């Protein structure tokens, strides 16, 4: 197996092997552009490094030095030679651009003897010693993890002693003294002398790149961006080009288009007599790239021609790094540039208009996840730089929120009514908190994962939420908490970012969401190519209307229980729960029925004839009963019972494992009158709206938590008898569908039997994931961190569908269901319906639709189109 490739041996299609940087250096070499030559150590060598117990094997080391010899032949220089040394840079380069990977090491190959000869021969001793002190600092920081700050302190001390403000004002003698001090600092921190042998330096740097693939920052970034650990990183070893040789040398970065707005103009900065990170370090003010035209017109002309060549070649906006050495231009890197979501849409549309790409390619260019930032407010970028970050939780629902801390839903509601902006901070939220959640700018919880109550409800409402911040020390009773060493009480100011999970002290200004015309164009192209329909999970007319505005083609999940928690309804529900007889229950349900009917009518109207799937009552009854003494007394008085009797009823509802207890279809089996009432409300609402709007409505009734076909058959009979009677009495031609959620593994395993009784399956992947993995979505956050660290799991299975296990059940149930009912309609309504990788899986399995939170509808539409286009290839 070949582990090392010269740049002249690769191309852009080898990024899996050579990494993004290596593949693009090879491609630029192939295009005849001025690239300092070198070689790439492959991602497979990185994988082997970990397999061999974090060692570089002898055969790979031999191959590295064979390629060093080839570099010597190409450059006419010799690695480790005093008279004519080959100096190199070492850079990491995974196949996907990854912040958090190892920083670059420049000027590798220098030692005290080499630098003395270099100073003499070049006639530029300042340059030689500047290179050496930079190398010592970079190697110490990057390879040996001695922090930059120690060396920066020594530089600042030297500048103060010499009475200068800039590094470039230090003389050769000053820099020589700095190099000596740096080596002393290195020895004091590491306990050994700085390595003089270039071979040891090179192998140390290569190992450091491989090690950085497994550092905490890289692991977090990989998990957030769905990058597998197995990919590994490549290493690029490249001949040095020096931008610090004087005023005819320099270094810079540039974009072929504006990465913030997408406007078509060259944008970037450069700095003369500089190297490495000087451009972005902020010590000296860089010049705009347009100024290079005045400083070096020929170099500028060559550079702009190269920019045009690269953008035309890659058919995308390029982010490039370059160095000028004595008026000679060298290209060090090109890659598809990172950009804002707004810029991504504009660039894609402009490239189509310029004839450089097709609309299909434009659809594939956009990362669906980035659309979130277009649909929600974000923090002002400049203000964020100065913000005081105090902690981090899970990025549960995107957007930015800033306001005063409140600890109860009631307080949130009151503050909102008084015109105050608040952030609701809770240990965890429950359905009782809905009103307060609606009134809050954002929600912060100590417990719970990506599919906890807080996360799911917040996403549905489009409200910012950070969940599972276990660093918070909460004192709910006294309304205070501590985070990042700071105590927050009621009224303290806080800001949370639901897109990153970051939490800040104080109020940060926000920028409003802005949807542009390019958004509509991209979405229209996506709709042209996708096969999957996209529905929404919505419980209120407001959510349904927002989802329609964002392109939803119906409601895939309406959770009826969320309608019961408003004050005028909860009393009737509690009355029903505490009834002694079926007659009493029916009387209580009769009060709820018109309210439910009104809700359903509003949803049917908002959906304008598109399908609406209504899930019958699902949660265990204990979630509806009062917990406060005053509420218990109120309920007792209204029912003519004693407080003690009500408390006994509440106690009788207690379950050791309520999520696997008396809930879902089991409620309808034990209390059929609940299913009858909900059926009447569904059918009457459909009839009323179909007559009012003169449109055909086909109600879709979904029975939850079915694990045995006889359960479905029993509840379905109740539904059909009730519905048929109403339709007959109303003398209307109306059809309706009865289906079930597949959320219990047994339902997936017996889907062929269940399909005979169902018009549709909707995979409830939140519960299906819980029951397949056997852990709670609210509690898993406690141990998932350890599982990520130990490489047991790479992703949160509640955020990204587990395709090996849960996915296998979905696939099996789809196949079995279609065997006995070829016309069965298949969809997914768990939170995975808005995750791009899960949507792609749904497309490949052959589902008919996905359903997700309203604000994730555009993400699902784009992801579905990308899945369809990819499957054509």
What spans do the regions from the language model cover?
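Nucleotide/phosphate-binding sheet-loop regions of phosphoryl- and nucleotidyl-transfer enzymes
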Residues: 1-387, 413-416, 420-423, 430-435, ...
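Short beta->alpha connector loops at strand-helix junctions that form conserved
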Residues: 39, 446-448, 467-470, 558, ...
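Conserved alpha/beta-domain cores
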Residues: 91-92, 515, 525-873
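Flexible inter-domain linker/hinge segments
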Residues: 206, 375-407, 520-536, 543-546
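Structural motif
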Residues: 236, 406, 423-425, 444, ...
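Glycine-rich phosphate/ribose-binding loops and adjacent secondary-structure elements
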Residues: 328-330, 427-438, 442-444, 450-456, ...
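Extended, non-globular alpha-helical segments
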Residues: 392-432, 483-521
């Amino acid at each position: 197996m070949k582990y090392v490739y010269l740049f002249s041996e690769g191309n852009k299609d080898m990024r899996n092997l050579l990494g993004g940087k290596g593949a693009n250096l090879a491609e630029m070499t192939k295009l005849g552009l001025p690239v300092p030559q070198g070689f790439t150590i492959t991602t497979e060598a990185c994988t082997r490094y970990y397999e061999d117990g974090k060692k570089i094997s002898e055969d790979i080391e031999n191959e590295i030095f064979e390629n060093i010899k080839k570099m010597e032949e190409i450059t006419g220089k010799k690695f480790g030679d005093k008279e004519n040394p080959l100096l190199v840079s070492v850079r990491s380069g995974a196949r996907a651009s990854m912040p958090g990977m190892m920083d670059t090491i420049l000027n590798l190959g220098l030692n005290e003897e080499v630098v003395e000869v270099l100073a003499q021969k070049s006639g530029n001793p300042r340059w030689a010693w500047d290179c050496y002190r930079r190398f010592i600092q970079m190697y110490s920081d990057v390879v040996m993890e001695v922090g930059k700050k120690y060396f920066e302190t020594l530089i600042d001390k030297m500048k103060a002693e010499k009475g200068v403000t800039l590094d470039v004002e230090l003389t050769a003698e000053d820099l020589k003294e700095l190099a000596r001090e740096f080596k002393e600092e290195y020895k004091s921190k590491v306990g050994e002398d700085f390595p003089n042998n270039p071979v040891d330096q090179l192998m140390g740097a290569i190992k450091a790149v491989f090690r950085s693939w497994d550092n905490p920052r890289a692991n977090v970034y990989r998990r957030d961006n769905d990058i597998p650990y197995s990919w590994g990183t490549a290493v690029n070893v490249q001949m040095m080009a020096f931008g610090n040789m004087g005023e005819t040398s320099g270094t810079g970065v540039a974009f072929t288009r504006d990465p913030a707005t997408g406007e078509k103009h060259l944008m970037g900065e450069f700095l003369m007599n500089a190297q490495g990170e000087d451009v972005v370090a902020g010590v000296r003010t860089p010049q705009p790239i347009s100024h290079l035209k005045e400083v070096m017109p020929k170099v500028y002309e060559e550079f702009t021609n190269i920019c045009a060549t690269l953008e035309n070649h890659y058919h995308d906006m390029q982010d490039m790094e370059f160095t000028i050495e004595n008026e000679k231009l060298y290209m060090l890197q090109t890659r598809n540039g990172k950009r804002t979501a707004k810029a991504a849409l504009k660039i894609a549309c402009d490239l189509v208009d310029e004839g450089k790409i097709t609309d299909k390619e434009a659809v594939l260019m956009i990362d669906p996840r980035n659309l979130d930032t277009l649909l929600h407010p974000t923090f002002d970028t400049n203000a964020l730089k100065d913000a005081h970050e105090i902690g981090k939780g899970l990025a549960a629902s995107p957007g930015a929120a800033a306001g005063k801390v409140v600890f109860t839903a009631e307080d949130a509601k009151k503050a909102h009514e008084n015109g105050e902006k608040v952030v609701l901070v809770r240990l965890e939220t429950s359905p009782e908190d809905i009103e307060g959640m609606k009134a809050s700018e954002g929600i912060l919880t100590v417990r719970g994962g990506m599919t906890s109550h807080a996360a799911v409800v917040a996403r549905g409402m489009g409200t910012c939420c950070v969940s599972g911040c276990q660093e918070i020390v909460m004192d709910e009773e006294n309304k205070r908490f501590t985070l990042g060493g700071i105590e927050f009480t009621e009224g303290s100011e806080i800001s949370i970012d639901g897109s990153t999970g970051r939490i800040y002290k104080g109020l940060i200004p926000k920028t409003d969401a802005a949807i542009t015309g390019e958004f509509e164009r991209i979405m229209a192209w996506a709709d042209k190519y996708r096969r999957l329909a996209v529905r929404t999970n919505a419980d209120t007319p407001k959510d349904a209307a927002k989802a329609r505005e964002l392109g939803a083609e119906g409601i895939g999940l309406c959770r009826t229980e969320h309608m019961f928690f408003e004050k005028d309804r909860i009393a009737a529900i509690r009355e029903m729960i505490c009834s002694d007889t079926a007659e009493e229950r029916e009387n209580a349900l009769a009060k709820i029925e018109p309210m439910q009917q009104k809700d359903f009518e509003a949803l049917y109207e908002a959906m304008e004839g598109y399908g609406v799937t209504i899930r019958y009552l699902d949660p265990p009854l204990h979630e509806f009963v009062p917990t406060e003494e005053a509420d218990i007394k109120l309920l007792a008085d209204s029912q003519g019972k004693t407080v003690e009797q009500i408390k006994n009823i509440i106690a009788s509802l207690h379950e050791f494992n309520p999520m696997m207890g008396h809930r879902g279809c089991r409620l309808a089996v034990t209390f059929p009158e609940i299913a009858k009432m909900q059926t009447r409300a569904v059918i009457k609402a459909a009839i009323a709206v179909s007559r009012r709007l003169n449109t055909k409505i086909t109600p879709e009734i979904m029975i939850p938590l079915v694990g045995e076909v006889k359960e479905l058959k029993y509840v379905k009979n109740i539904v059909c008898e009730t519905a048929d009677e109403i339709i007959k009495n109303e003398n209307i031609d109306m059809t309706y569908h009865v289906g079930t959620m597949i959320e219990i593994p047994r339902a997936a395993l017996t889907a062929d039997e269940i399909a005979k009784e169902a018009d549709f399956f909707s995979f409830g992947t939140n519960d299906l994931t819980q029951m397949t993995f056997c852990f709670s979505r609210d509690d898993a956050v406690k141990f998932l961190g350890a599982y990520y660290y130990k490489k047991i799991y790479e992703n949160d299975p509640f955020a990204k569908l587990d395709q090996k296990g849960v996915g296998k059940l979905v696939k099996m149930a789809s196949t079995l269901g279609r065997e006995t009912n070829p016309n069965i309609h298949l969809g997914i309504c768990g939170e995975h319906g808005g995750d791009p990788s899960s949507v792609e899986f749904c497309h490949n399995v052959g589902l008919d639709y996905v359903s997700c939170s309203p604000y994730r509808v555009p993400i699902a539409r784009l992801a579905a189109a990308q899945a369809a286009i990819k499957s054509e290839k």
